[in-house]
UniProtKB/Swiss-Prot annotation:
Disulfide bonds: none annotated. ATP binds at residues 24-29, 81. Pathway: Pyrimidine metabolism; CTP biosynthesis via de novo pathway; CTP from UDP: step 2/2. The active site is at 396 (nucleophile), 527, 529. Keywords: ATP-binding, Glutamine amidotransferase, Ligase, Magnesium, Metal-binding, Nucleotide-binding, Pyrimidine biosynthesis. Belongs to the CTP synthase family. This is CTP synthase. L-glutamine binds at residues 369, 397-400, 419, 480. It comes from Mycobacterium sp. (strain KMS). CTP binds at residues 23, 162-164, 202-207, 238. GO terms for cellular component: cytosol. Gene3D superfamilies: 3.40.50.880, P-loop containing nucleotide triphosphate hydrolases.
Length: 579
């Protein structure tokens, strides 16, 4: 009789997170929170998202359908859940953290064309599933420091029963077979709905969801029961029996006051302890020092600050997920709660509209975006805030709108972006040289922007240099357009300072007004929100929230900002009260 195959106990463990009954149960936050707990126990954890859509990446998808595109350090356009992973694990991930059906099929078809399958009939099994497995197992490779992860948490997108998810679930099943059951863990998230007329929690949807998962060969090791209230022990015992799961693996996760409370909820239910026992992982007790400090800042703020986010996609808050999380983290830094005011950019085109929307806020954030819709409203919001000393932070497109507004204020009345008006006589924002083919339709749009981390050099004693406490920084980018250097001198007449550029001085990365002219009006071509962490707020957002708190505390009349006419004569704006 042949010897039984043995799997090394020191192998990287693989934990898969699946979902059933309905989508949007919080698989990503559940996996991120569990990853945070395992990290706090001294383990090396990395994460991955498997997305079952045919797009190669979300870069060309409508923000209303998909939410934000999260850009990694290496320039990959990924799912917003990757942002949750980075924020909860407090580590940078790469493009390999997001795998889509489009990537898998593109790779397999390319290999077939190269003849790598030696004449085989290319099929979903084994060729597609093998490609998926290779992406999953590659996450166990050592990082740049030679450290191999103890645990890889892989979230399988979609819902059990979806046709699109089947190849990913089959690949996950095969991974368990290859690495050994003792090195693999399946965590299934399911809905336990509350029926108000009968006053009952219903377990049948979870039973059917687990039955569907078992029908394709996967027996979950633990269940996350999502509900608006605690699931009582009697129902947990029933679910454990009917779904053949250890009672220790049946986890009640009622809605939490904050996403940052979820690790505490999972720890209270002892999920992390169950996982480390089941996978035979070395561990220590959870170190709550940093997370408890965060929760104190979340739940016991000393003051409140109101920030207006003037955007184009405000009907879906996920379109600005990293921005809102970075703003909240900036508030945590100051022991302050950030109240979001969602403002449709179209509402701010006229000064009266901007006044109605922004009169009682303490700061204005202009986020990124694409296309002409709502642009004049963003510019109108900047103009309103500039004339009243209201703190402003512009991101990517926000910087470009700040530059356009400054140019118009000194008489360049036709100032615009080549993106919004290709025929503008004054393209103060122009197409980057290496992006012209893509803009003209002569090259692919997907994956061709200026993506990923790029360095910038900051002017000493500038607002941004003081915020960063450095003159050399690196931020992530996602854009095709840049400030037109031919207009720099004329725009500078407005007082706008180009306080940060690429190392060669060519590309404008940061702009600001001197503090004597405006307390805080700063723009960056980058997306600093992508590097913010709840426990390590981004310095630019911390500085912005600090300026907003100062503005609120002063309760002053807005400062008089000199408006430059094209002939160089100053025109003072009439001061107006905040209210």
């Amino acid at each position: 009789m042949p010897a039984l195959r043995k799997h090394p106990q020191t192998a990287t463990k693989h934990l898969f997170v699946t979902g059933g009954v309905v989508s949007s149960l919080g698989k990503g936050l559940t996996g991120s929170s569990l990853g945070q707990l395992l990290t706090a126990r001294g383990l090396q954890v990395t994460m991955q998202k498997l997305d079952p859509y045919l797009n190669v990446d979300p870069g060309t998808m409508n923000p209303f359908q998909h939410g934000e595109v999260f850009v990694t350090e290496d320039g990959a356009e990924t799912d917003l859940d990757v942002g949750h992973y980075e924020r909860f694990l407090d580590r940078n991930l790469s493009g390999s953290a997001n795998v889509t059906t489009g990537q898998i099929y593109s790779s397999v078809i390319a290999k077939e064309r190269r003849g790598e399958y030696l004449g085989d009939t290319v099929q979903v099994i084994p060729h597609i599933t093998d490609e998926i497995k290779s992406r999953i197992l590659a996450m166990a490779a050592p990082d740049e420091h030679g450290n191999r992860p103890d645990v890889v948490i892989t979230e399988v997108g979609g819902t059990v029963g979806d046709i699109e998810s089947l190849p990913f679930l089959e690949a996950a099943r095969q991974v368990r077979h290859e690495v050994g059951r003792e090195n693999c863990f399946f965590l299934h998230c399911s809905l336990v709905p509350y029926m108000a007329p009968s006053g009952e929690l219903k377990t049948k949807p979870t039973q059917h969801s687990v039955a569907a998962l078992r029908s394709i060969g996967i027996q979950p090791d633990a269940l996350i029961l999502r509900c608006d209230r605690d699931v009582p022990e009697a129902l947990k015992n029933k679910i454990a029996l009917m779904c053949d799961v250890d009672i220790d693996g049946v986890i009640s996760t009622p809605d939490a006051p904050s996403i940052y409370d979820i690790p505490k909820v999972l720890h209270r239910e002892e999920l992390d302890a169950y996982v480390v026992r089941r996978l035979n992982l070395p561990f220590r007790d959870v170190d709550w020092t940093q997370w408890n400090d965060l929760l104190k800042r979340v739940h016991e703020p000393h003051e409140t600050v109101r920030i207006a986010l003037v955007g184009k996609y405000i009907d879906l808050s996920d379109a600005y997920l990293s921005v809102t999380e970075a703003l909240r983290a900036g508030g945590f830094f100051h022991h302050a709660k950030v109240e979001m005011r969602w403002v449709a950019s179209d509402d701010c085109e006229l000064d009266s509209g901007a006044a109605a929307a922004l009169a009682d806020v303490d700061g204005v954030l202009i986020p990124g975006g694409f296309g002409i819709r709502g642009i004049e409203g963003k510019i109108g919001a900047i103009s309103y805030a500039r004339k009243r000393g209201l703190p402003v932070l512009g991101l990517c497109l926000g910087l470009q709108c700040i530059v356009i507004e400054a140019a118009r204020s000194v008489g360049i009345t036709g100032a615009n972006s080549a993106e919004f008006d290709p025929a503008t006589p004054d393209p103060v924002i122009s197409t980057m040289a290496d992006q012209r083919d893509a803009v003209a339709g002569a090259a692919d749009l997907g994956g061709t922007m200026r993506l990923g981390a790029y360095p910038a050099v900051l002017e000493e004693d500038s607002i941004v240099a003081r915020a960063y406490q450095a003159t050399e920084v690196s931020e992530r980018h996602r854009h095709r357009y840049e400030v037109n250097n031919a207009y720099r001198d004329r725009i500078a007449e407005s007082g706008l300072r180009f306080s940060g550029t690429s190392p060669d001085g060519h590309l404008v990365e940061f702009v600001e007004y001197d503090a004597e002219q405006h307390p805080f009006l700063v723009g960056t071509q980058a997306h600093p929100e992508l590097k913010s962490r709840p426990t390590r707020p981004h310095p630019l957002f911390a500085a912005f929230i600090g300026a907003a708190l100062d503005y609120k505390a002063a309760e002053r009349l807005p400062v008089e900002i000199p408006e430059q006419r094209s002939n160089g004569v100053e025109l003072l704006q009439e001061p107006a009260s905040r209210g």
